[in-house]
Curated annotation (Swiss-Prot):
CDD domains associated with the record: G-alpha (cd00066)
Purpose of the protein: Guanine nucleotide-binding proteins (G proteins) are involved as modulators or transducers in various transmembrane signaling systems.
Protein family per UniProt: Belongs to the G-alpha family. G(q) subfamily.
Domain G-alpha residues, every copy: 41-374
Species this chain originates from: Rattus norvegicus
Keyword GTP-binding: yes
Classification of source organism: Eukaryota, Metazoa, Chordata, Craniata, Vertebrata
Protein's name according to its UniProt entry: Guanine nucleotide-binding protein subunit alpha-15
Region (G4 motif): 273-280
Stretches the record annotates as G3 motif: 204-213
Pfam families attached to this UniProt entry: G-alpha
Length: 374
């Protein structure tokens, strides 16, 4: 009969083979214990929201605030993306001018526009002087400016006015993107992206899922072991339509997505952090685009950004409350989650640092206290 091994017995009672097996067993247990410690010490947050709500910008801010930031070499790598964003923006306005029947105001604008349209934005390798001169000329054209004011009628990157206002600097031969240039750069998120960093000795892993509808089916495997959900929504999209569907209002789609996510079983007891983003764009846009034109239930004054922000927050709060209500008339005791809402400007590092500190002090501290990690 083969004897059973008891590793607690005296070492000299074991054969060499048993000693080797015991050593391997101890090493495996040590590795498993270390993995458990790492898993216990790492907290995962899921970052969700519709496309262009600012999720990637938020991740970049976390890298600047809590990570290594962006070295000169890192920033240099964004140069072609900045050029691409500029060409995409100017070409979008040139095409929209024709569709909206807005004429150019300057004599040589058509010639400059034709030159800009010859470049494939996704094959840009440099920002050659003729293109830079053409864009600077066009950006001073009153027709282009009038088209920009009607940007809600076509798809235009939020960063367009920022980059076009800095063309002279960006067109320099030795151009290296600044941290702000990097934050403003836009590349659609596809698939799942993760970023890890530490806050007060706590390891955080933020999982960023693609915001476009075609990407949402890939989120499912990210839902497990999430301590909090961060949902980003744009305040400025109330008068815009989806890039994928020109008939669907972006804010209504975001509210519907928020509701869908809250109803998922994975989030029944997960705290929800709501970032209502792009306060700066809302404050600029509200002067020319009345919120009530798109959401008739808004009865606040025109051109009042604070009233608009409160109304939009209330819409999201009502969605949250409706998803938290029991469907059978009883209590949903299993739902111990809470909603933490913040207004943000993801391109403002100081603002994001302050907001994330509030998140850390509320949501993360609450969770760590519950599992006795504090």
């Amino acid at each position: 009969m083969a004897r059973s091994l008891t590793w607690g017995c005296c070492p000299w009672c074991l054969t060499e083979e048993e000693k080797t097996a015991a050593r391997i067993d101890q090493e495996i247990n040590k590795i498993l214990l270390e993995q458990k410690k790492q898993e216990r010490g790492e907290l995962k947050l899921l970052l969700l929201g519709p496309g262009e709500s600012g999720k990637s910008t938020f991740i970049k801010q976390m890298r600047i605030i809590h990570g290594a930031g962006y070295s000169e070499e890192d920033r240099r790598a964004f140069r072609l993306l900045v050029y691409q964003n500029i060409f995409v923006s100017m070409q979008a306005m040139i095409e929209a001018m024709d569709r909206l029947q807005i004429p150019f105001s300057r004599p040589d604008s058509k010639q400059h526009a034709s030159l800009v349209m010859t470049q494939d934005p996704y094959k840009v390798s440099s920002f050659e002087k003729p293109y830079a001169v053409a864009m600077q000329y066009l950006w001073r054209d009153a027709g282009i400016r009038a088209c920009y004011e009607r940007r809600r009628e076509f798809h235009l990157l939020d960063s367009a006015v920022y980059y076009l206002s800095h063309l002279e600097r960006i067109a320099e031969d030795d151009y290296i993107p600044t941290a702000q240039d990097v934050l403003r750069s836009r590349m659609p998120t596809t698939g799942i992206n993760e970023y890890c960093f530490s806050v007060q000795k706590t390891k955080l892993r933020i999982v960023d899922a693609g915001g476009q509808k075609s990407e949402r089916k890939k989120w499912i495997h990210c839902f497990e072991n999430v301590i909090a959900l961060i949902y980003l929504a744009s305040l400025s999209e109330y008068d815009q339509c989806l890039e994928e569907n020109s008939q669907e209002n972006r804010m209504k789609e975001s509210l519907a997505l928020f509701s869908t996510i809250l109803e998922l079983p994975w989030f029944k007891s997960t705290s929800v952090i709501l970032f209502l983003n792009k306060t700066d764009i809302l404050e600029d846009k509200i002067h020319t685009s009345h919120l009530a034109s798109y959401f008739p239930s808004f009865q606040g004054p025109r051109r009042d950004a604070e009233a608009a922000k409160r109304f939009i927050l209330d819409m999201y709060a009502r969605v949250y409350a409706s998803c938290a209500e029991p469907h059978d008339g009883g209590r949903k005791g299993s739902r111990a989650r809470r909603l933490f809402a913040h207004f943000t400007c993801a391109t403002d590092t100081h603002s994001v640092r302050s907001v994330f500190k509030d998140v850390r002090d509320s949501v993360l501290a609450r969770y760590l206290d519950e599992i006795n990690l504090l």
